[in-house]
Amino acid sequence: MIDTLKGWAEYLVEWAAKDPYGFLITVLLALTPLFLASAVLSWKMAKMIEAKERDQKKKQKRQENIAKAKRTKKD
C-alpha cells in the first residue's frame, strides 16, 4: 500500500511539474465545492449562535423583570 501511495504521490508531483496551470485549475475546481459548503455552514452556524444569544438575553430580561415584580410586591 505504501508503494501505491508513493507512486501516486510521484505521479502528482510529476503532473504538477509538467503542467502547473492545469494542476492548479484541477485542484481549485476540486476544492471549490468544499469552500462553498464551508461558507454556507459557517453562515448557518453564525445565525444559530445569534438566535441563541437573543433567546438568552430575552430569558435573562424576563427573569430580571419577574424578580423586580416580586420585590415590588413584597414592599
From Swiss-Prot:
Coiled-coil residue spans: 49-75
Keyword line: Coiled coil, Membrane, Transmembrane, Transmembrane helix
Chief place where the protein resides: membrane
Highest taxon in the source lineage: Eukaryota
Record's bilayer topology term: Single-pass membrane protein
GO cellular component: membrane
Record's subcellular location: Membrane
Segments traversing the membrane: 21-41
Positions of region (Disordered): 52-75
Alphabetical list of InterPro entries matching this protein: Smim15 (IPR027877)
Pfam families: UPF0542
Skewed-composition ranges (Basic and acidic residues): 52-67
Family of this protein: Belongs to the SMIM15 family.
Protein's UniProt name: Small integral membrane protein 15
Organism encoding this protein: Xenopus laevis
Native organism taxonomy: Eukaryota, Metazoa, Chordata, Craniata, Vertebrata
Gene: smim15
